[in-house]
Amino acid sequence: MKNNGISIRLIIMNFLQYAIWGAYLTSMGSYLVNIGLGAKIGIFYAMQGIVSIFMPAIIGIIADKYIQAQKVLGLCHGIAGLAMIAAGYYGLVAGDSVNFATLFSLYSISVAFYMPTIALSNSVAYSGLEKFGMDTVKDFPPIRVFGTVGFICSMLFVNFMSIDGVQFQLSYNQFFTSGVIGLVLAAYAFTLPACPVAKGGESKSVAEAFGLKAFALFKKKDMAIFFIFSMLLG
């Protein structure tokens, strides 16, 4: 990779971006079972998909028209991290008497602001690479790989770390871990290269912001078949 300076900075961003997710995504169910919310596991995971329907578009409009993407990335991670830490603190205080509505509300706020950051982090990376004259097609994939590395490292940390004989993967400490990493990335995001915002005549329509124009691709038989089998495999 050319220009190692920006590459390393974006590697760190991607590592932290997915480490946040890896801290609880595979282990949250075990904690919910331990506190008597095993029947609600599906609802917790479904919320990630629900907020992903509209939050990325809303945050994307803000980043596209009003505030630089790296700043929006930092703000979103700040809110998501604080909400996740609050969820962990509530789990600590409540012990085995966790109220579903309270924990779920805090968790939902966190994922509502986390899910848009996946696309935002890609936008920040593309902008940074282009600013330094690099090829996004060739130079971004090796950077993105470290997102997967971050996810795995965070997951393993939670799986093997324990306090008083209780593994993080079985307790609220996984939320603390995710939240702290989120706050670190929130601060780090503000140090990343500035991303341009759209000029007055370049604003996107609502259809473009929500990605609705992509459905036109399904007019092509090959794309429709690919999409159907992708859903079956996913």
Kindly give the residue locations of the regions a language model identified:
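Helix-to-loop junctions at the C-terminal end of transmembrane segments
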Residues: 54-68, 162-163
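Cytoplasmic helix-loop-helix junction between adjacent transmembrane helices
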Residues: 106-146
